[in-house]
Amino acid sequence: MSHQETHGFQTEVKQLLNLMIHSLYSNKEIFLRELVSNAADAADKLRYEALTKDELYEGDGELRVRVSADSEKGTVTIEDNGIGMTRDGVIEHLGTIAKSGTAEFFKNLSGDESKDSQLIGQFGVGFYSAFIVADKVTVRTRAAGHAADEAVQWESAGEGEFTVENIVKESRGTEIILHLREEEKEFASDYRLRSIITKYSDHISVPVEMWQEGTPAQEATEEGGEAIPATEGHWKAMNKATALWTRNKSDVTDEEYQEFYKHISHDFADPLLWSHNRVEGKQEYTSLLYIPSKAPWDLWNRDRKHGLKLFVQRVFVMDDAEQFMPSYLRFVQGLIDSNDLPLNVSREILQDNKITTALRTAVTKRVLGMLEKLAKNDPEKYQTFWAEFGQVLKEGPAEDFANKEKIAGLLRFASTHTNEAAHTVSLSDYVERMKEGQSKIYYIVADSHEAAANSPHLELLRKKGIEVLLMSERIDEWLINHLSEFDGKQLHSVTRGDLELGELEDAAEKEAQEKLETESEGLVKRVKEVLGDKVAEVKVTSRLTDTPACVVAGAGEMSSQMIKLMQAAGQAVTESKPVFELNPEHPLVKRLDTEQDEEVFGQWAELLLQQAQLSEKGSLADPSAFIKLMNKMLLASVK
């Protein structure tokens, strides 16, 4: 036995241990689900490695997990004969959290125990869940293929440190011994453990065994009766030990599907919906796909691992096979079991593979179909999905041209039709309500729902009763750049150049607009002269009814929201000059037109321009100059 080393836990592990003990006390039994799940994963990994290195089995290919309790000692032991760990592996896996964004996870914790419990569940506590019920944990492990004297013992009381030393262990795999806290001794009971295994681990594909005591022989109790022979004690599987996805859908209960989801995702909450399908023919595969009910805390972390579990002919191959699911569906959990891929498939082979491409196409359509069905049959439940994952789905049109129309049908927006901030309006809803003669879908993108709903750009459209989609999420401008039409109707921004009302604008309105332009030629010329190159163009508009002026993007120019998006991404963008539109019917513009003092005229023109820019962009390059100018004009008006 080698000398013992003492190591300190990574700071995040200390925080997690403390959190679990205080936040998960109402759901303590999940420690067994997590540890049995990890043990089954270790068996799966050995089965895969042994495909090319049969010697790793060391003559024992019967993979299993064993759970036992010692009520006198107050211990629970979870043992597997899976892949095992080396000394370095033990220090890495049992002393740190190798997840990116961990610091961000801890920032998200609120102190509300029920909410934090959900977050911790999403984070995936795994091995550390042992400390929910134990005040000391001992791990004895030997990696498959290593000598007996290369085994390792890890031990910790969960208080900041752990010890590691080499030991001798004849059998491969990992043994975890939980020394239960005094108040948790209820778990040192075979009956209690058996009930938890039956509840949480029935779906696990390796046997989860517990010791069954033998029975003594019994003599015949009556004439003609048969004597009952003695039975020896033996290990007996407590679960079905068949891969859940290989069973017929009709034989699997909702509870089993839900527990299997928790097994593969390590989420504590039930999934929102799932789809289990077996496909035979040109390609043979089974998919089991889940939509979670809550977005994971690190959904927007670029380094977050995502993807499906990959099995080939029921043999586990890899986690997080992102090649089967597009990025905009990265929230989908589940697995795919292919009969056509080679067992020795690697991530590199998956990258450029016709089978992978075909499977990706099929499961993508399957997920979109699930969502279409949900949106149609249960709009309320779909709203739950949209609130959690809508922004991610909006990445779809840019990423998946083949399914652009399907994705567009799943999008939801706020709208002037509902006057609510909730995103409940689909593009199909909008098209159904379009006015006679309307050929475009009108929308506005702004910094907030309030800014969009109160934008002066909506004034004429509101007056005419034309619905406008209100967009205020950062990704919306990006979405619209890749979704130019829906159902043959072009999407048109109300903040861009001409409103293009087409048949919605009658001959009298066109005539009135032309008359206004003619009458305002002098005003337009004067304003352009005083503003100079601050604007690309000055014109009069009929789009405004209550506001004196607005700015719009010129034809072919980037909108203010797109410029903000590019700048936020760190790209240098030269801001284009806006088109400045005046409402000649507004009292302030009429006042401007009658001003003879050129200096005062220039100040009024500048004030109206900056007001319009503030309304459009939500900020100004030099707000203090704007305030000085406004104060100057206010003082002049009270003299």
Curated annotation (Swiss-Prot):
Subcellular location, record wording: Cytoplasm
Region annotated C, chain positions: 565-639
InterPro entries registered for this protein in UniProt: HATPase_C_sf, Heat_shock_protein_90_CS, HSP90_C, Hsp90_fam, Hsp90_N, Ribosomal_Su5_D2-typ_SF
Domain of life: Bacteria
Record has Methyltransferase as a keyword: no
The keyword Cell wall biogenesis/degradation is assigned to this record: no
Record key words, sorted: ATP-binding, Chaperone, Cytoplasm, Nucleotide-binding, Stress response
Main localization category: cytoplasm
Region (B): 348-564
GO molecular function, one term: ATP-dependent protein folding chaperone
Gene Ontology, cellular component aspect: cytoplasm
CDD domains listed in its UniProt record: HATPase_Hsp90-like
Positions of region (A): 1-347
Family: Belongs to the heat shock protein 90 family.
Job description of the protein: Molecular chaperone. Has ATPase activity.
Subunit structure: Homodimer.
NCBIfam families reported in the protein's UniProt record: PRK05218.1
Protein name, UniProt field: Chaperone protein HtpG
Gene giving rise to this polypeptide: htpG
